[in-house]
Amino acid sequence: GFAGLTSRFDLVKPVIAAVNGVAMGGGFEIALACDLIIASEKAVFALPEPKVGLAALAGGLNRLPRHIGVKRALGMILTGRHVSAYEGEHLGFVNEVVEDGIALERAHEVAEEILTCSPLSIRASKDAVYRSLDFASLEDSMKGMREEYAAVRQMIESDDFIEGPKAFAEKRPPNWKGR
């Protein structure tokens, strides 16, 4: 897939897209394959493939409906309609809109915020969110999470699982070990 991201489902670290301009077709599919999208106020998104006899087969047709719902996604996909960053934020596939030219800078700031969290908690949280999408109901997605999700089990059995609440109670920053 595009940039090696659209066909990867084994990335345990958060991936942030910083979109400063046009993200159409494959570019939008790459952004949708990321966990977070930070977009410049001038960014534009679209899956215009049907206008040229193609289809967004690198995940766009699968990911967009999961982000914004089937009807909204089909409205974009079947028309190839261009969507502004602000509309993307309103629809739910853009996490944050920033001033033109600073999307990458803001993505780095968000990455720094993520780095203050327990790495095992981040991994477990990301894994649980994506795995839950495979289930038809909320109840089914939660059953067995502690036992069946390796990343969740690793987090629960870690030193960090004790360190976080202890640091909070002691009103100090946690010292994450990642184990």
Each language-model region and where it sits:
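Glycine-rich beta-to-alpha active-site loop
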Residues: 6-52, 82
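C-terminal long alpha-helix characteristic of the crotonase
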Residues: 38-43, 94-146, 153, 176-179
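Terminal low-complexity tails and localization/encapsulation signals of metabolic enzymes
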Residues: 166-179
